[in-house]
């Protein structure tokens, strides 16, 4: 009888603890869905992405003994941690071993794409890979994933770091504050947040950051800061969680946009609406002008529709963001720079793509609970960085 009670007690404890353990495991951040290219130039793709893409069925057996995938009558089987594979039941040569990291299983991309009929387009400048299936049947399914080179980002590595730098441009020194965000870090999220969660309101940058549980934040789009009215119109597209908070049809200014994997890019304003309608944009802010294209200064301020002398010729407090080739986001503030000088600063800071944000008294940068650059007024919206 005593033994039965002990077993019953143990069962009850297990019933209580197991959901909690499962909940804790579920709460751990998963790796972003990204193609991984190792130091030997071998490419791997997350099994989690493949499952369901273009009708692919993928299974990691309960014992972890085999990885099985199938599509359109073709099948492929891997053994985790071991070379070799089986295609349609026949052994094939394969030197790349499936592996798991950060809770994600990766499988060799080349053999999977060849066997299951997936076309690959490597986008060097964007650091991404576009996968297409079914193009020959008129039912094409397409997805684009970031490409991570060298080593996978560990969840224990820093996700967001700050810095203070001095850059020389044209014989003049500029002191800048930066926050660098590892976009492919498992814990990182971005969001575009409205002041007061309402179009037309204003709020302190620190207040927006704190109520968003943000590790970092920078001011966002231009807005009508000088009206006497309570409603201060933001200018440009604002997208959050895939929803359009502020439309700006016809606006040609540059848009910073990112998808659900935080694959970030800068898009001309004239092209943005079509991209948003395609369903790939998870978040976005429109400001401009564009500063860098593929690592080179590329200013076309008038073509983006700017007429204000503060942008065309003047200097002042500046905010900007940049994207590096290895999927880092640079948030930067500087004082007294013209737009051409800001472009040079962003290049020296390591950005490959870059654009200007609202500046002047709006310019502000927040990190780790305090201001690195304090804005001189309330702002309309902000780009915030969250770590789960």
Sequence positions of predicted segments:
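Sec-dependent N-terminal signal peptides of Gram-positive bacterial secreted proteins and lipoproteins
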Residues: 2-27
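Zymogen propeptides
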Residues: 21-26, 53, 57-59, 101, ...
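Extracytoplasmic Gram-positive cell-surface binding/anchoring modules and repeats
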Residues: 28-65, 91-128
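N-terminal post-signal-peptidase region of extra-cytosolic proteins
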Residues: 34-35, 63-67, 94-97, 163, ...
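Signal peptide-directed extracytoplasmic domains
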Residues: 70-72, 76-91
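Conserved, well-ordered active-site substructure
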Residues: 137-139, 228-249, 306-357, 362-388
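Short acidic-glycine loop/turn motifs at beta-strand connectors
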Residues: 182-185, 225-226, 257-263, 294, ...
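Active-site-adjacent helix-turn-beta-strand microarchitecture at beta-sheet edges
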Residues: 224-297, 301-302
């Amino acid at each position: 009888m005593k033994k039965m009670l002990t077993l019953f007690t143990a069962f009850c404890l297990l019933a209580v603890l197991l959901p909690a353990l499962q909940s804790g495991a579920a709460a751990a951040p998963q790796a972003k869905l990204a193609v991984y290219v190792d130091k030997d130039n071998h490419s791997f793709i997350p099994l989690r992405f493949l499952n369901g893409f273009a009708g692919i069925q993928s299974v990691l057996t309960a014992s972890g003994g085999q990885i099985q995938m199938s599509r359109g009558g073709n099948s492929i089987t891997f053994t985790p941690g071991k070379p070799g594979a089986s295609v349609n039941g026949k052994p094939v040569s394969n030197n790349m071993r499936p592996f798991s990291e950060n809770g994600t299983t990766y499988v060799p991309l080349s053999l999977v794409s060849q066997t299951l009929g997936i076309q690959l387009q490597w986008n060097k400048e964007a650091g991404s890979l576009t996968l297409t299936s079914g193009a020959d049947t008129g039912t094409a399914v397409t997805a684009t994933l970031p490409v991570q080179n060298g080593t996978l980002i560990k969840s224990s590595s820093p996700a967001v770091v700050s810095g203070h730098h001095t850059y020389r441009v044209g014989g003049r020194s500029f002191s800048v504050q930066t926050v660098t965000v590892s976009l492919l870090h498992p814990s990182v999220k971005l969001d575009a947040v409205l002041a007061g969660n309402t179009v037309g309101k204003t709020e302190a940058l620190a207040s927006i950051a704190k109520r968003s549980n943000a590790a970092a934040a920078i001011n966002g789009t231009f807005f009508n800061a000088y009206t006497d009215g309570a409603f201060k119109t933001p200018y440009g597209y604002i997208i959050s969680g895939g929803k359009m908070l502020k439309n700006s049809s016809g606006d040609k200014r540059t848009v910073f946009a990112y998808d659900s994997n935080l694959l970030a890019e800068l898009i001309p304003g004239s092209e943005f609406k079509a991209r948003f309608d395609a369903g790939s944009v998870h978040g976005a802010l429109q400001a401009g002008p564009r500063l860098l294209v593929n690592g080179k200064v590329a200013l076309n301020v008038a073509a983006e529709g700017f007429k204000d002398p503060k942008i065309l010729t003047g200097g002042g407090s500046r905010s900007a963001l940049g994207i590096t080739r290895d999927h880092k986001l640079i948030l930067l503030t500087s004082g007294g720079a013209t737009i051409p000088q800001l472009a040079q600063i962003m290049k020296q800071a390591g950005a490959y793509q870059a654009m200007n944000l609202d500046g002047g008294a709006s310019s502000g940068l927040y990190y780790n609970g305090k201001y690195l650059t304090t804005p001189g007024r309330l702002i309309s919206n902000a780009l915030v960085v969250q770590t789960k």
